[in-house]
Curated annotation (Swiss-Prot):
Primary localization class, coarse: cytoplasm
Organism: Leptospira borgpetersenii serovar Hardjo-bovis (strain JB197)
Gene (UniProt): tpiA
UniProt EC number: 5.3.1.1
Pathway: Carbohydrate biosynthesis; gluconeogenesis; Carbohydrate degradation; glycolysis; D-glyceraldehyde 3-phosphate from glycerone phosphate: step 1/1
UniProt-recorded name of the protein: Triosephosphate isomerase
Length: 250
């Protein structure tokens, strides 16, 4: 059975005081209402240490929004997986649309990061999705196929147990627009099909991997989305940054 995951992406939001206060509230409320769903939190890098310390010893996973695929080295402004491990970080998000769109992150660089992280026993949340222009020009499946085939190139079958995917239609992020359940299901089904075709024997992996939906997910639409066969949770932005709306996702 696939795991249901609710992943909160705080992006470059919240002051330190707000982040730590929210972490305390999450620690108090979420374990009691999680109902078997896995909770992940992705604070900004500056707040990782404080949030991880608060949530230490709970089942809530603290993740990083980005990483550089290297050990300790001279890469100014970057963060090494080795440093993240010291903080108790177990999950790293790779390929978020904002990093692709604004920071030029490519499928091949995502692939390099994913290989490095899996080799070092991290869980990877890999994001894929199309822009509004790509959807309107009929390129949704072409774009996502490239992101999957190039981003997951060379990943060994045994490593997929530490891999989660998220479909985030860029046109539905922070816009208030949400893909209809049918639209989301269509793409999630396609993602499973693409994973099944990566290598011989990948069909079973495709059926077992969790695929989250990200795009203006809120308490009032998540249950409808999760009724779809191939949707296994949410990658949530704004609604994860307040305790009432985050708790409402469970």
């Amino acid at each position: 059975m696939r795991k249901t995951v609710i992943a909160g992406n705080w992006k470059m939001n919240l002051s330190e005081k707000e982040a730590l206060s929210l972490a305390h509230s999450i620690k108090e409320k979420i374990p009691a209402i999680s109902k078997g769903r896995i909770s992940m939190i992705f604070p900004s890098t500056l707040h990782l240490a404080g949030v991880a310390k608060i949530l230490q010893g709970t089942e809530i996973l603290v993740g990083a929004q980005n990483v550089y695929p290297s050990g300790l080295a001279a890469f100014t402004g970057e963060t090494s997986p080795e440093q993240l491990k010291e903080l108790g970080v177990k999950v790293v998000m790779i390929g978020h649309s904002e990093r692709r769109q604004f920071l030029g992150e490519t499928n091949s660089f995502c692939n390099e990061k994913i290989h490095f992280l899996l080799k070092n026993d991290f869980i990877v949340l890999y994001c894929v999705g199309e822009t509004l222009m790509e959807r309107e020009s009929g390129k949704t499946f072409e774009v996502i196929s490239s992101q999957i085939r190039e981003g997951l190139k060379g990943i060994h079958s045994h490593s997929f147990s530490n891999l989660i995917l998220a479909y985030e239609p860029v046109w539905a992020i922070g816009t208030g627009k949400v893909a209809t359940p049918a639209q989301a299901q269509e793409v999630h089904f396609f993602i499973r099909k693409e994973i099944a075709g990566l290598f011989l024997g990948a069909k079973e992996i495709a059926e077992s991997i969790s695929i989250l939906y990200g795009g203006s997910v809120k308490p009032d639409n998540i249950q409808t989305l999760l009724k779809e066969k191939d949707l296994d949770g949410g990658l949530v932005g704004g609604a994860s940054q307040k305790i009432d709306t985050y708790a409402g996702l469970f």
